[in-house]
């Protein structure tokens, strides 16, 4: 990452922190949503629950039944994924910049 490209930080009224880093060398946008929950938050008897919850997004939502979000992203030439670690769970979508609204609708 180029350290000369600034990162703008905004905290919304609901407490959500938004970080924005604009790079204009390609017509794409990548949207990441980070949650401060991971395996360190689990207790005996529910280990793996953070990763399980991560995978539930891929099972569908009220707006995107199972399989529809992946099809919509693929139609636009994008990709998405998620990951769980010790202290975070994150989801991301990378799409043509003019279609970033699709990523915002699922999150």
Tell what function each PLM region has.
Residues 75-80, 102:
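N-terminal Rossmann-like or analogous alpha/beta NTP/dinucleotide-binding catalytic cores
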